[in-house]
Amino acid sequence: MKKLFVYVALMLPIVLLSLNIQAQTADEIIEKYITAIGGKEKWKQVKSMKVNGFIEVQGIKINFTQQAIHNVGVRVDAEFQGQKIIDITTPTKGWSQNPFGGRSSLQPISEEELKQKLDELDIQDEFIDYASKGSTVEFLGKDEEDGNEFYKVKMTSKNNNESVYFFDVNTSLIYKEEKTVKQQGQEMKMVTKVFDYKTIPFGIKIPHKSEQMGQILVTDKIEINTTIDENIFKGN
């Protein structure tokens, strides 16, 4: 028993020190990232956002508009072959209309679908004041891809959604996000690469292109703190 006590007494400070270094490393990476995208104070001024762009799939372009009010609601509207595609998320409910996915009219989404989408309501970037939002982070070390080095940080949100982010060692910007999502009852790994970062007139830096499962999303226009009618977040 005495030997065990001595072992614990010796090891505990080392374990605590290791955990402290790990947390500090993750926080340092996050702090540099926030600085690189315009700074905490600027991002905390973002109350609403309207984005126009298009998704390119196998040479076909699908225009979309995304409107969001911070922690109130997110709505995406698109049209393809004359069919409307709508996606609405609020803190308590969500709706979806996608004729190509079996939903010909606006229908409520399941609790599981809503849980996976709740983090999207935070439009001030998930890493801004992440701890006060109920999220935790973990430094996973370094990784390399195409000759470039990246820091890996896992974030677990208050909604228990997990994502692994890859931060470019040189620019401090996010290059990739990996997460597991459930679709039609099956788990699926989702990898999203983001690039073409641009500083918009508001003074924050946002990626204008992303790639996911062979689809390219291109952002043409971003409006910050524009007036958005909250009624657009009402389903049926």
Language model: regions and residue ranges:
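Flexible, processing/modification-adjacent segments and terminal tails
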Residues: 22-35, 96-161, 182-188, 195, ...
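N-terminal mature ectodomain segment of secretory-pathway/periplasmic proteins
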Residues: 28-102
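Well-ordered beta-strand positions enriched in small/hydrophobic/aromatic, beta-favoring residues
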Residues: 51, 76, 94, 137, ...
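Gly/Pro-enriched, hydrophobic low-complexity segments
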Residues: 149-235
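Residue-level detector of high-confidence beta-strand sites
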Residues: 88, 142, 176-177
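Bacterial Sec-dependent N-terminal signal peptides
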Residues: 1-26
